[in-house]
């Protein structure tokens, strides 16, 4: 889903629309210019480049806006002492912060964030999610794919639970709880497998 929205993968069916405009046929680089930034699972930084260089790479695709290196460092202050260090020397949480910062450097209207907590120590996840909450409070639209339901529910306004390309539950985050989401996802999966699910 995320890669289809970003233009990195063609959708199998349907259309991709941004503000009511069909962008399905637009290449990924054009979608970036239109305001879509993807922070993929696995971070995918340039290991030999410094933190600052990794951030500035994304600035080439930048549209006008608030996000620059200084603004990213305000949201992720733990990156300041690492600014001139190679990305390969960073912890997983620091790398994830750089990846999110790189997405922000394009000044997107829509930030696609795939599995922000994957493979991170709990303390790193805490730091990333504190900063992500700040980004959202500033008005950034974030589409977050996350298996850590507790954390996702704390930052989300709206939740859409999908299974095999179909929406199985959606609603305002404050009206949904973990059990309801888990039941929708796993209950439907058990039913599809011939079990006694919901």
Predicted regions and their residues:
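Glycine-rich phosphate-binding loops of nucleotide-dependent enzymes
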Residues: 1-198
